[in-house]
A protein has these predicted regions:
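N-terminal cationic amphipathic segment used for targeting or macromolecule association
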Residues: 6, 10, 35-41, 103-104, ...
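Disordered, charged N-terminal biogenesis/targeting segments of membrane/secreted proteins
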Residues: 1-25
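Single-pass transmembrane signal-anchor helices and their membrane-water interface zones
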Residues: 7, 11-15, 31-53
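Beta-sheet-rich non-transmembrane sensory/scaffold domains
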Residues: 51-622
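Short secondary-structure junction/hinge motifs that connect adjacent elements
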Residues: 23-33
Length: 622
């Protein structure tokens, strides 16, 4: 029999053994938990994020399925970081003030990121049509806020259409109608209009927003003005999106608009990713075979072209172009739409070269249908419609080039850049309309750092004003394009200021409207000389002025230029100048209330009719 001491030792040994087992089991459990935690943590931190776009296979039977797939890929935003670990470490570095914040300017860079004669006059309606808008192309009429017949002046005064008689001092308002109200809609932009060739219909174009579902539309409405004292709404049509530009050609209204895809709405409703035409509640999508899209989208915005009958607003055809969403130029045969983007190239030593590129796509409209006929890729960007011109089967284009080089650094899920350098210049291209090949051109003809500020084509001639706006000096170039592929050119040399608009003024003269070295108004007359382009005379005034070309009165027959101004010394005025072959003379400055952008004027016989916030008839001016 064990003694008490032996029994006590035995119990102590058992307790010690149990404690060791507990410690071992606890260690095993702890180790297991740690291993499990590491596995879970690794799964949480290092498992890659899913970078696959959402599944859209449920729409495979849709005629738009191919387009849906491309839109889905273009609108899907991949995770910025590879996994949670990269996200957390980047956030910690940012908190500490490390990483890209101390590495120069940070930015995300993604390759491919977006950039005949006059119509015949007709003797019906409210008179004979008379053109008052200085259209870029003869017979391709542009919208404005002033139109006229031989009997009446049609003025779009903000949201009211007003009709005045042309009767010198007896001119008077004979009819008006509110055109700013659309049932259930809010107008979001200024309105513009057309007058039909028989002077019986005014067409109003505006952007509007539905008060019900906040859908944006381009609203086109026609008004019967046969009786100016009783103006009546005669029709309307809507296109989803917002307006870019429009033209009226031979009784057809060419409406150019843009529509942005609502990627947050998915593809269940066509209205979220397709432009539509009709009336609210009865809209029809542009057909799938009328939509042109590049294989890789650089934009989720359409340019939409709708061809309408100008009288009844019936749709003749429609087409949409994904990614073509910048400038619009319309010739007698084609609509040209531009798409600008950045072309990125990797160089040695971590350097990156980014060039601004522009794709110009041509759409034929003369057959009564809209048909894509080709496109061309050019270096640089197109400033506006006047930088493009189709003549004799050749598309002439002036672009402003921009090359940027920088060193790129990547780390912690961020992209940083340093040592940024920019080169700018101007190119002239001549493109064959047969195969869209470049058949002639002049590259980098301007002083380094300058861009094209104004361009004007006139038959075989081209005029280009380049400037470095910060310096405020400008050469004006004259190009002879009559013997392609040979191109010859002359320039004025350096002139103080620069022209924001160049205008053929007739009889070999060129009119420049722009700024002097003090950023005030400068109007200059140029002419071609044996050794270059010479300045004949200029007129300068300490005043601000409109840069809206449609606001200028250009009378080539009488060498008259008119525009609204706001002198620094007083209120708004309308300036009227005449060139006598030697100098520009003020022949009648008139006080006129309103913004220079919306001032308009027209000369009929020897009287001038002025429109601002008020109407004035003044004469005789000669």
């Amino acid at each position: 029999m064990k003694t008490y001491s032996e029994r006590a030792n035995c119990v102590a040994e058992k307790i010690e053994l149990l404690q060791k087992r507990r410690i071992r089991n606890r260690a095993i459990l702890t180790s297991s938990c740690l291993v499990l935690a590491v596995v879970i943590l690794a799964a949480v931190l290092f498992v890659p994020y899913d970078t696959s776009p959402p599944d859209v296979s449920m729409y495979r039977n849709s005629p738009y399925y191919g387009l849906i797939q491309r839109i889905n890929a273009a609108t899907y935003q991949k995770p910025r970081y590879k996994n949670n670990y990269e996200f957390l470490t980047t956030q910690m570095n940012n908190v500490k003030g490390e990483g890209f914040l101390n590495s120069g300017a940070a930015m995300d860079m993604a390759p491919g990121t977006a950039m005949p004669d006059e119509a015949p006059e007709m003797e019906v309606g409210t008179g004979t049509y008379e053109e008052v808008t200085d259209n870029q192309v003869a017979g391709v009429i542009e919208s404005d806020i002033l139109k006229r017949s031989d009997k009446y002046l049609f003025r779009l005064d903000k949201k009211v259409l007003k009709i005045y008689t042309i009767a010198k001092e007896d001119s008077a308002l004979v009819g008006s109608v509110d055109v700013g109200s659309v049932d259930g809609m809010l107008n979001t932009t200024d309105l513009e209009m057309y007058l039909s060739q028989d002077c019986s219909t005014v067409t109003i174009i505006s952007n509007c927003l539905s008060e019900v579902d906040k859908t944006a539309y381009v609203c086109v409405r026609s008004y019967d003005v046969t009786d100016p004292t009783n103006i009546q709404l005669s029709g309307s049509i809507f296109v989803t999106g917002s307006g870019i530009s429009s033209r009226m050609v031979d009784g057809k209204l060419l409406l150019v608009s843009k529509f942005r895809i609502r990627s947050d709405k998915g593809f269940a409703e066509e209205s979220s990713f397709l432009p539509q035409i009709g009336t609210p509640g009865n809209m029809t999508s542009v057909p799938a075979d009328s939509i042109l899209a590049p294989e890789e989208l650089s934009s989720t915005q359409y340019t939409v072209i709708t061809m309408l009958d100008a009288k009844d607003l019936e749709v003749s055809d429609s087409a949409a172009f994904l990614s073509y969403s910048d400038e619009i130029y319309v010739s007698r045969e084609h609509i040209f739409a531009t798409r600008s983007y950045a072309d990125n190239q990797k160089l040695d030593g971590g350097r990156v070269l980014t060039k601004t590129m522009t794709e110009i796509s041509a759409i034929s409209y003369t057959s009564g249908t809209l048909e894509h006929v080709g496109s061309v890729m050019l270096e640089g960007s197109v400033k506006n419609q006047y930088a493009m011109d189709e003549f004799g089967g050749v598309l002439r284009v002036v672009t402003s080039t921009s090359e940027q080089t920088y060193t790129e650094y990547q780390g912690n899920g961020m992209v940083s850049v340093d040592d940024w350098r920019t080169n700018r210049n101007v190119n002239l291209y001549c493109v064959s309309m047969e195969d869209f090949s470049i058949i002639a051109g002049v590259r980098g003809f301007a002083p380094q750092g300058e861009t094209a500020e104004s361009v004007r084509f006139d038959g075989h001639m081209a005029y280009v004003c380049t400037a470095e706006v910060v310096v405020l000096t400008d050469p004006v170039y004259f190009f002879d394009l009559s013997k392609l592929p040979e191109i010859s050119y002359k320039d004025t040399g350096t002139i103080e200021g620069y022209s924001s608009s160049l205008v053929n003024f007739g009889e070999g003269y060129l009119l420049g409207i722009g700024f002097n070295e003090n950023r005030c108004l400068k109007i200059e007359i140029y002419e071609e000389a044996a050794e270059g382009v010479e300045s004949v005379c200029s007129y300068e005034l300490d005043a601000t002025f409109s840069q809206e070309y449609k606001a200028y009165l250009i009378d080539r027959e009488n060498w008259i230029i008119g525009l609204g101004i706001w002198p620094y010394s007083g209120g708004s005025q309308y300036l009227l100048l005449q060139f006598d072959g030697y100098e520009l003379r003020d022949i009648g400055t008139t006080e006129l209330q309103g913004s220079p952008d919306t001032m308009r004027a027209v000369i009929v016989e020897d009287w001038i009719y002025l429109f601002g916030d008020e109407f004035k008839a003044k004469g005789p001016i000669f």
